[in-house]
Amino acid sequence: MGSDRALLVGAAILLAGMMTAPVSGHHGTAASYDGSKQVTITGKVTEFWWHNPHSALFVDVTNEKGERVSWSIEMSSPGVLLRAGWTRRTFVAADAVSVVVNPSRAGTPVGVCLNPCAVTVNGKALSVREP
């Protein structure tokens, strides 16, 4: 199951990179994510990647059919998150989270929560808002 997840995450990242590279520069999230929509993802953390250029949060969600769906959420860089008071230990596996994201235009379980970013982890509200 772990290798299937790694393959899926790798394929999603590769596909997102291939779709956005010709259309926009580094911060061209509009090509991949729908900025006019917001979706609240509520579930359990499976992983949190604390690395440049963007951190990533992985959340397992139970959909309306009772099926598990694994979401990948792109977040700000560790430097931006540090200034907001976050650390590499802000999220750990099995934490209950709620994250407001702009969803993927492709309809896949991928979203972006950059600036501003609102998250609730184990009942505690966190945010990132840079000028």
Predicted regions and their residues:
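OB-fold/S1-family single-stranded nucleic acid-binding modules
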Residues: 104-130
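Short nucleic-acid-contacting surface segments enriched for D/E, G, S/T with interspersed K/R
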Residues: 82-99
